[in-house]
Amino acid sequence: MMRSWVSLILAAGLVACHTEMMKVTELKAIPDAAYAKGVSAPFCGVVGDALVVAGGANFPDKSLLDGGAKRVYADIWAQADGEWVHAGVLPDSTAYGATFAVDGALVLAGGNVCGTTTDKVYELTFRDRAAVLRALPPLPVPMEQCGWTRDGDRLYLVGGVGTTGVYACTVGEYVWTKLADLPEPLVQPVAFASAGKLYVWGGFNPETLEVSDKGLVIPTDSSVIPSEAKESPWAEAPAIPDGGTFVGATGATLPDGRLVVVGGVNRAIFARALHNTPEDRIPYLSKEPAEYQFRQAVYAFDPAAGAWTLLGSDPACALAGPGVAVRPQGGLYVAGGELKPGVRSPRIFSLAW
């Protein structure tokens, strides 16, 4: 969630009527004292057959409720054959960035470094089980808590803290150009690109404090469209299922072309919390995790059908800011995330259906 007080608290679309059988399989946690309390908003992806979790943030010493300080990490952990290896460190301690899986590597873009939004981008590969990092061209503007997605050889970054920009680059070149501006500022949206269209769902407006349940779509072959254009290039997309939001959720594109979204806050509870006063802080942070009603349901969006499908629901998925990556064997990995404001989960598990 965001670092300020706003961050501490942080039209239903078409939904297919059937539910697929979802299986949750527990995996080994990262064997490190700093990660024992879990992290949220890490870089997370798969290189070869190895799950990679890097960076992330938590409150290791004292809880947020007790005035604890957030710590951001630089560690790079890789799991292959069921065992975790400390594979190296990031150039900076980073959380809230974007992760792209690209041809035997991960591209790590933006994030928050020591309280400052960064424009840095790195390629992460492995040599003899050790992480190798190569600096790529920086982003046009610093970005964190943005939406991100890949479609073919194109990567997209959408919104986040301090920008309404939508940016794209080509894999291998990594020179980012601006496609358009969002209709409004959106922090923590979920993005998805398919068949020449870029979709954006959820997010919250840090200026109006409104929490979006809407979907937006724009052609990805558009030239740059100024924000002051008389006609918006954005059209409505099928809204978020159940009238909720995807603030705090993480999306991943499956090999079959569907978007799967895991986690996220409860829209109504989060919207009320955005208006909390300092006097509300202790009562709000003192609640049990279940009282925040983070989303347990996992949904998939099929761009061909233009509809959402409920894949399943499990309390393990009630997380904000989890790392999510596509498993080579099918399904997803889910790593860490927030159980409630300031409290992380150390669990790492897979989802299959």
Predicted regions and their residues:
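Sec-dependent signal peptide recognition
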Residues: 2-11
